[in-house]
């Protein structure tokens, strides 16, 4: 059993509780990779309270533990931030990913606005049994209420995605 907490690298003074670390989360298991001998697994953890409710997503990869041979450790490999960050936007309020972890939808829902959902595509590079993960913003969805305003529609308060990420 592993306990996962946000890194304490000095990048923030926010505690895990203040970050709302774990507010949203998703595990993806893409299958056997040609560059590794075991099935890859990814864990995405939302922290919408990070840095005065700016928010961010932590990505972890299931990997080899201290003994050097057993896969038993989640290791942080990336943080994902909004393309339009700002205090109070709460990026990471909800998140959803397809089964492979290649497509990620992340909502920002701050009080009094319509909210938005940012869609990211993984653009990782693999070589020599090592992978550098990256995500690129491909689309931003916003909510509009029936009266045409963008107030209080709570767009992105709930997310779902198909296994392949096309819907």
Annotate each PLM feature.
Residues 1-167:
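Conserved beta-strand/short-helix segments
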